[in-house]
Design a protein with these regions (language model features):
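N-terminal lobe of the biotin/lipoate ligase/transferase fold
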Residues: 1-103, 128, 176, 251, ...
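Long, positively charged amphipathic alpha-helical accessory segments at protein N-termini or as interdomain linkers
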Residues: 1-4, 18, 92-112, 122-268
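Short loop/edge segments at beta-strand edges and connector loops
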Residues: 27, 114-116
Length: 268
């Protein structure tokens, strides 16, 4: 199931001031995150440039998990960000993008949620994963790349993934124009990023984020290597940490860089 998908068509579908205004497209690359960082380092690529590939041979997710998709079925892209804020704030970019993807998917008519910190889900199955990486310049962020993989037109998944992953096609019963989906994500990301940099935290986006948080008020298991525990997800704080209430009423602030969170009874 293929659609027209190239630099020109993605550009035509992207109506923004800066996010994805410049599009780079390749049939194949190692990973769009690596490509974006190389382009910044070697070619002077700048803020908001978007790198899109039909296939990536070395795509990765959180905790270095491999990620790949059949050609002509997914969106694999990375946006380059050159921020002024401190490196400690960079992990929040994952949540900004997660909200943006969820809003785009909602706009095309699907009931969508965010599985904190970096997955977007439909029918409690993963439809999108996000990986943010940064390159330092002295003690500042030189650039950050936010990598996004969206399952768009896949008609099936391998048996071992079928209970955890889905696609826009499987959930809606019809294919989607991937360029239009990219354009919607960029529109929402530009709006959300501009709100984020005003405060350099998620205070302005928190109400919208929590409305879409699939884990909200759900039992979760925090997979901390030293001290795994169960509790109830109560939302996020302004720093993007998940607030988990233990059985005794104490509330933990869970940092996404250190642990995974799973639903007690399912992936979410």
């Amino acid at each position: 199931m293929s659609d027209l998908f190239n630099e020109e068509i993605i550009s035509q579908a992207t109506h923004t001031k800066w996010a994805g205004k410049t599009v780079h497209f390749a049939r194949e690359t190692d990973s769009t995150n690596l490509w974006g960082k190389r382009a910044w380092r070697e070619e002077g690529a700048g803020h908001g440039e978007l790198f899109v590939a039909e296939y990536q041979s070395a795509g990765r997710g959180r905790f270095a998990r491999r990620w790949s998709a059949p050609p002509d079925s997914a969106i694999t892209m990375s946006i380059l960000i050159c921020p002024e804020f401190s490196p400690q704030k960079a992990p929040m970019l994952t949540l900004v993008m997660g909200l943006s993807v969820a809003q785009a998917v909602a706009e095309i008519g699907l009931d969508v949620g965010i599985k904190w910190p970096n997955d977007v889900v439909v029918s409690r199955k993963k439809i999108c994963g996000i990986l943010t990486e940064m390159t330092m310049k002295q003690d500042k962020i030189g650039c950050a790349v936010i990598g996004v993989g969206i399952n768009v037109n896949m008609e099936s998944f391998p048996e071992e993934m079928a209970d955890k992953a889905t696609s826009l096609y499987l959930e809606s019963g019809h294919p989607f124009d991937r360029a239009q989906v990219v354009g919607l994500v960029m529109k929402h990301f530009e709006e959300n990023y501009e709100r984020f940099v005003q405060t350099e935290d998620l205070s302005g986006l928190k109400p919208d984020y929590e409305k879409m948080l699939a884990n909200l008020n759900q039992p979760v298991r925090v997979l901390d290597q030293n001290d795994p525990y169960e509790g109830t997800a109560r939302g996020i704080n302004a720093g993007g940490e998940l607030l988990v209430e233990r059985a005794d009423g104490t509330v933990e602030e869970v940092n996404s860089g250190e642990v995974s969170v799973r639903g007690l009874y399912s992936y979410v």
